[in-house]
């Protein structure tokens, strides 16, 4: 009986060990977070890299994988295929995807201002939006074209006759080679590529979408709606936001440090600290809530303005109906604020 008792105890211990290992593995798996970026490693995403590098995610008990984006990577497709828990995306693309059947929900809005603009050479004869007529304009597609199409509709231009659209690659060559009068640029990136290529700022004219009244919200964080029904997911993402906001606050406060971290994360070796520092300084201008308790909070009024812009696209609206409050949630942001 003693021997049988020992065997039974041994078996029980083994079972408990296996169960414990299984539970531990489950807990570990639950702490994993994969975030899909919209583009390649650069200061546009410094907050995530800073949070990773300085151990902020680890301090929250998270194992975070940061997946760089690229010209052939759609954040919407990635999260729809369950290859990411959360994605960085622009609101126009996210709302268009939601209407098309991918139920994305905004859980945080990092960028409060738009950095998108059209950059034109004065020599092309463009000095005001009225001069766009008859001109070739470079436009990014893949979800980035929506703000432009809305703007043209507001101006009363037909994109198939009044202007010529050049589907712009993710470079500034069309402007440098005079293939287009204007091209799409971000204040923190492509605009400076034009300047670095030798074009004097005095020879350029820029049109900020923000100032033209056609800006839509850009870099925000999105998850699948069904996931928000899981309290464990909400808690995990709350920790993710808390650490991410800490990373962004640091990046805004110390652009030079952020630049070094971003360069270290760029496995291609093409990034430079000088360029990334400048980019971070310009990105900081778009995160107006950095350093405050409101960082990452999506203002309902800002959401409504974006929806209004997207619906006002003439015969080709980005979305056909107002998605309503279901398209965003503050539940994760509130969890991060506790």
Model-derived regions: residue spans:
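Bacterial N-terminal signal peptides that target proteins for export
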Residues: 1-14
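Short helix-capping segments at alpha-helix termini
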Residues: 55-59, 155-159, 197-200, 268-269, ...
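N-terminal signal peptide c-region/cleavage motif recognized by signal peptidases
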Residues: 20-26
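Pocket-lining segment of extracytoplasmic ligand-binding domains
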Residues: 92-93, 170-174, 178-268
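Short, glycine-/small- and polar/acidic-enriched structural segments
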Residues: 31-177, 181-188, 208-209, 215
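A bilobed periplasmic-binding-protein/Venus flytrap-type ligand-binding module shared by bacterial periplasmic
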Residues: 50, 116-126, 217-234, 291
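Secondary-structure end/capping motifs
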Residues: 230-313
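Conserved C-terminal helix/tail region of periplasmic/extracytoplasmic solute-binding proteins
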Residues: 303-338
């Amino acid at each position: 009986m003693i021997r049988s008792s020992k065997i039974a105890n041994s078996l029980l211990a083994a079972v408990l060990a296996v169960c414990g290992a299984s539970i531990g593995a489950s807990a570990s798996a639950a702490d994993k977070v994969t975030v899909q970026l919209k583009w390649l490693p650069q200061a546009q995403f410094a907050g995530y890299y800073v949070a990773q590098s300085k151990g902020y995610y680890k301090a929250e008990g998270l194992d975070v994988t940061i997946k760089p984006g690229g010209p052939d990577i759609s954040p919407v497709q990635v999260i729809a295929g369950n290859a990411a828990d959360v994605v960085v995306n622009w609101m126009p693309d996210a709302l268009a995807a939601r209407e098309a059947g991918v139920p994305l929900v905004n859980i945080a809005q990092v960028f409060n201002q738009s950095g998108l603009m059209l950059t034109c050479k004065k020599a092309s004869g463009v000095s005001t939006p009225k001069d766009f007529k008859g001109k070739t304009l470079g436009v990014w597609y893949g979800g980035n074209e929506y703000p432009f199409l809305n703007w043209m509709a507001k101006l009363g231009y037909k994109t198939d006759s009044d202007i010529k659209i050049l589907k712009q690659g993710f470079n500034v060559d069309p402007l440098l080679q005079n293939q287009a009068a204007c091209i799409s640029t971000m204040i923190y990136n492509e605009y400076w590529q034009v300047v670095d290529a030798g074009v004097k700022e005095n020879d350029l004219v820029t049109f900020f979408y923000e100032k033209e009244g056609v800006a839509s919200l850009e870099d925000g964080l999105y998850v699948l709606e069904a996931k928000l029904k899981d309290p464990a997911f909400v808690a995990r993402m709350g920790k993710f936001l808390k650490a991410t906001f800490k990373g962004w606050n640091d990046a805004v406060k110390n652009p030079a440090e952020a630049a070094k971290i971003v360069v270290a994360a760029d496995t291609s070796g093409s990034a430079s600290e000088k360029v990334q520092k400048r980019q971070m300084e310009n990105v900081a201008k778009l995160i107006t809530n950095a350093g405050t308790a409101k960082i990452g909070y999506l203002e309902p009024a800002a959401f409504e303005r974006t929806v209004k812009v997207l619906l006002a696209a003439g015969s080709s609206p980005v979305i056909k109906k107002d998605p309503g409050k279901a398209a965003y949630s503050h539940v994760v942001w509130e969890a991060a604020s506790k």
